């Protein structure tokens, strides 16, 4: 009886470790895997898909605070955005757009509207949507 239990545990251990080491390209396994965005990401180099994220330990307190404010549930709220801008000023980077009344959607041209649409979708922070928004912004500056 001990041999059967021991063999079963050994078998489950080997199987689970094999599953754990398998790398999965999630873009091949979603419901809309045929969508162009998933096809582009799936065909991308594995290094680009499985890249390493920056570690919080390697960031200073302002970078950590910026990430914390941006990733909160209500991170787009005015208070959080002001805190992000404050931390960016403390870091010395002036990448924050000036605060002022934004242009209405009706006053924007087609590329501006497309960039805004890509960024404000449910998954607007995903790579393909960000890439498309940047492409539309490049079209703005080019023409």
Curated annotation (Swiss-Prot):
Q: What are the record keywords, sorted?
A: Metal-binding, Periplasm, Plasmid, Signal
Q: Name one GO cellular component term.
A: periplasmic space
Q: A single GO molecular function, which one?
A: metal ion binding
Q: Where is the signal peptide?
A: 1-20
Q: State what induces this protein.
A: By silver.
Tell me where it resides. Answer: Periplasm
Q: What is its main location?
A: periplasm
The family assignment reads:
To E.coli PcoE.
Tell me, what does this protein do in biology?
Component of the sil cation-efflux system that confers resistance to silver.
Name of this chain's protein: Silver-binding protein SilE
Q: Which organism is it from?
A: Salmonella typhimurium
Q: Which gene encodes it?
A: silE
């Amino acid at each position: 009886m001990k041999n059967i239990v021991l063999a079963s545990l050994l078998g489950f251990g080997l199987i689970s470790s094999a599953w754990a080491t398998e790398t999965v390209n999630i873009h091949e396994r979603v419901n809309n895997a045929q969508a162009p965005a998933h096809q582009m990401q799936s065909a991308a180099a594995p290094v680009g898909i499985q890249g390493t994220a920056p570690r919080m330990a390697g960031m200073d307190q302002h970078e950590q605070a910026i990430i914390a404010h941006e990733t909160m549930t209500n991170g787009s709220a005015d208070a959080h955005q002001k805190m992000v801008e404050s931390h960016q000023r403390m870091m010395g980077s002036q990448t924050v757009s000036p605060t002022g009344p934004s242009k209405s959607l009706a006053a924007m041209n087609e590329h501006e509207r497309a960039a805004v649409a890509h960024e404000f979708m449910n998954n607007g922070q995903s790579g393909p949507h960000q890439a498309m928004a940047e492409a539309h912004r490049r079209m703005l500056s080019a023409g």
